[in-house]
Amino acid sequence: MRQSLLSATGQSLNLRDNGFNVIVGQRQGKTYEKAVEDGWVPGETLFGIEEACDKATIIMCLLSDAAVMSVWPTMKPYLTAGKALYFSHGFAITWNDRTGVVPPADIDVIMVAPKGSGTSLRSMFLEGRGLNSSFAIYQDATGKAMD
């Protein structure tokens, strides 16, 4: 993952602070302004969702269940062959008949699900602690999903 360009829609500070090559995709508004306050630079590390998804090799969907469903139509066209889609929880993908979140067959789909909120995860990270997580591979199109 360290060699990949990660696009995060949602929580991303821990990735940046751990040295990952990460950009943020946000819609204009409060969350975009918050990202700027957190040090993300428009046009360098902060983009609209479409541009961030287009640039990335791993597209991280780190949003609430409701937000995943609303942003899915925006993200889906950028899930091209060989990319990976990363979730932080499994509702949208597990209940895809209800959410409409059906990834293309030629991408990897993985999940790393912390056992707590993004806020808790960030607080614990800043304290030098971690949080238990579950890991799953939903789809391994490239044979590299475990990497």
Locations of regions flagged by a protein language model:
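Gly/Ser/Thr-rich loops at beta-strand to alpha-helix junctions
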Residues: S4-T9, G29, A66, L85, ...
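Glycine-rich, highly charged phosphate/nucleotide-binding loops
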Residues: G39-E50, G116-S117
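Rossmann-fold dinucleotide-binding core
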Residues: Y86-D147
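Short, surface-exposed connector motifs at secondary-structure boundaries
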Residues: L13-G19, D54-T57, L131
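Short, glycine/charged-enriched secondary-structure capping and boundary segments
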Residues: N14-D17, D38-G39, T74-P77, T99-P103, ...
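Rossmann-fold NAD(P) dinucleotide-binding segment
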Residues: G48-V101
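NAD(P)+-binding Rossmann beta1-loop-alpha1 motif at the extreme N-terminus of oxidoreductases
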Residues: M1-G43
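Structural motif
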Residues: N21-I23, T57-M60, K83-A84, I107-I110, ...
